[in-house]
């Protein structure tokens, strides 16, 4: 490819609405352009990298005996209603009606579609196992699209679905996909960790997320420094933190004017946060749910949802919902409260091990002091569960070792679905005895476009992107200092041909721009190798090869360039 033929409009300034480094650099380097909020068009450089990621995914999926198919993006509402997810999926699902007023959605995922497809074709155990996958666009109506490709409304995803006769078969399929994902992300050059996770709206009995470690990640993960334990903080298992036992003091009310946060109360009463309890109120499945944790802890929304067996993600309760169940925002505790059909109380396990703590008095500008939960809560009428987020002070639930925290970008997830969809959609097969059984399913997703963004978040500097060789749009760029110099251009063309013949994916920058402009673009776009051809190098019958990752510049004889470049690329 010649640069004069390449459509790659670069920008010198950082776009004002670009939130994270990957978004900034993809816009500046001419990889994509914003179409609307959460929607992007890929330009040639970006699409080349996307296709390289897809090629790696296809090779490893095929190696794992998965077979590629393609299903419609547009899905009928009927199959989602049959599975029970039409309403449960919530506002993130993009729904449309055709001219006949039939309901459809733009697929956020394809469990219903693939199950409906397979159940009409497979009827015997002899036809199982089978694993089918596709790579296509998915759609989610994000409330706040942001971070470029990491939280967009349309994104490219590989989704695979396995069907087995029993749990042992599912375990084998799951391990096969887990191993394939490990190979895929290693080949893409990512630093990542598989972590235990929550299955969310997709459901199932077990799941792992593949997290690319990056400060820009939206997910918080914990991992053990001694063993292989790693988990999304939403599913991390906190221990019970016990306080030293104290003599129980008399419960009393104190005035706390305008102190509607637990931090303000602690400051006003000169209390450490761990001697307070705080309330967070959610709306889940139409029920108001009061969650109570220690003042120095944070509520785990996923754990609260599980504690009340909620089918939809928690949302913050509205003032109207608080009023309906008689709660006063900023001054709430379980003291004197009882659960009803419309109101649930969930208390963290560590709260139940506190003594003489402070919490809301359930009236404006007042708090209780000397709350003792085992005495003052209606313990037979509350749910006690581990609903706090794990902290740096917790220990590994597996081996007792120290835990480290990190930010991660979810680039893939594998699920053990079991019979959640096959039972709902009646996808059965006849076993060896002629009896019908539901197929045992797994599903496996990779965010292809998100993987691209994650790689940039991990590999960049102040000058631009530093691509892993495997997913770079071009592996090398040849930069003649002066495109008007026939000798330089002739040598550059010779090197270009030699590299192409050696199988190197190479770009020749034949633009007549100044050398400084070409160098800046090369660093911004992030080609792994830059081959500079100048009068000075030609005097010694050499060129200069610069490694983008290290900045190291190496002289190389012209007739050895193809060999040297191939050798260098093996280590990038």
Regions found by a protein language model. Give the residues of each.
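Generic long, charged, amphipathic alpha-helical segments
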Residues: 464-518
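C-terminal structured "cap/appendage" subdomains that terminate the fold
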Residues: 496-556, 560-561
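C-terminal, non-catalytic macromolecule-binding modules
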Residues: 265, 442-471, 475
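TRNA-binding/sensing appendages of the translation machinery
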Residues: 1-98, 110, 161-200, 297
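Charged, low-complexity intrinsically disordered tails and linkers
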Residues: 1-28, 114-145, 256-260, 458-462
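Acidic, His- and aromatic-enriched active-site or binding-groove loops in soluble protein domains
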Residues: 87-104, 212-223
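Short, hydrophobic beta-strand segments
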Residues: 38-43, 156-165, 209, 411, ...
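Extended, low-hydrophobicity, polar/charged segments
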Residues: 111-116, 144-158, 168-442, 448
């Amino acid at each position: 490819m010649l640069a004069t033929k390449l459509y790659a409009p670069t920008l010198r300034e950082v776009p004002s609405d670009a939130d994270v480094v990957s978004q900034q650099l993809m816009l500046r380097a001419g990889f994509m352009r914003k179409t609307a909020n959460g929607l992007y068009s890929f330009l040639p450089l970006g699409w080349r990298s996307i296709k390289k990621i897809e090629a790696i995914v296809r090779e490893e999926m095929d190696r794992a005996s998965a077979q590629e198919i393609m299903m419609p993006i547009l899905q009928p509402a009927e199959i989602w209603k049959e599975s029970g997810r039409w309403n449960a999926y919530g506002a993130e699902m993009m729904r449309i009606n055709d001219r006949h007023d039939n309901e459809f959605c733009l697929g956020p995922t394809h469990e219903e579609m693939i199950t409906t497809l397979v159940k009409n074709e497979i009827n015997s155990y002899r036809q199982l196992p089978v694993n089918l996958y596709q790579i296509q666009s998915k759609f989610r109506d994000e409330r706040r699209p942001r971070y470029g490709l990491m939280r967009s409304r349309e994104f490219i995803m590989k989704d695979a679905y396995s069907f087995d006769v029993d749990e042992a078969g599912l375990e084998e399929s799951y391990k096969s996909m887990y191993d394939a994902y490990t190979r895929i992300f290693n080949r893409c050059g990512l630093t990542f960790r598989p972590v235990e996770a929550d299955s969310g709206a997709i459901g199932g009995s077990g799941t792992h997320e593949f997290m690319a470690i990056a400060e820009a990640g939206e997910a918080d993960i914990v991992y053990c420094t001694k063993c292989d334990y790693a988990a999304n903080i939403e599913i991390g298992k906190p221990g019970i933190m016990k306080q030293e036992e104290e003599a129980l003091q008399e419960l009393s009310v104190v005035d706390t004017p305008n102190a509607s946060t637990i931090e303000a109360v602690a400051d006003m009463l000169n209390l450490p946060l761990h001697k307070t309890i705080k309330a967070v109120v959610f709306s889940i499945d139409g029920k108001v749910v009061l969650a109570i944790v220690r003042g120095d802890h944070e509520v785990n929304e996923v754990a609260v949802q599980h504690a009340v067996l909620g089918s939809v993600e928690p949302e913050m309760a509205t003032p109207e919902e608080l009023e309906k169940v008689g709660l006063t925002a900023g001054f709430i505790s379980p003291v004197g409260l009882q659960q009803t059909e419309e109101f649930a109380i969930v208390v963290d396990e560590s709260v139940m091990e506190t003594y003489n703590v402070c919490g809301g008095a359930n009236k404006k500008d007042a708090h209780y002091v000397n709350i003792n939960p085992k005495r003052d809560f209606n313990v037979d009428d509350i749910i006690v569960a581990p609903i706090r987020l794990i902290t740096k002070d917790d220990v590994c639930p597996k081996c007792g070792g120290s835990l480290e925290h990190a930010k991660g970008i979810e680039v893939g997830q594998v699920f053990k679905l079991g019979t959640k969809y096959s039972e709902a959609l009646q996808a059965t097969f006849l076993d060896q005895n002629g009896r019908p059984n539901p197929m045992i399913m797994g599903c496996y997703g990779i965010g292809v476009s998100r993987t691209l963004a994650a790689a940039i978040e991990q590999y960049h500097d102040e000058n631009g992107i530093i691509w892993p060789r495997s997913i770079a749009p071009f592996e090398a760029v040849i930069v003649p200092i002066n495109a008007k110099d026939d000798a330089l251009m002739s040598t550059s063309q010779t090197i270009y041909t030699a590299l192409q013949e050696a199988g190197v994916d190479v770009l020749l920058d034949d633009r007549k721009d100044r050398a400084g402009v070409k160098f800046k673009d090369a660093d911004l776009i992030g080609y792994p190798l830059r081959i500079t051809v100048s009068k000075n190098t030609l005097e010694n019958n050499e060129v200069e090869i610069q490694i983008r990752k290290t900045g190291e510049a190496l002289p190389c004889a012209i007739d050895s360039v193809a060999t040297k470049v191939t050798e260098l690329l093996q280590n990038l």
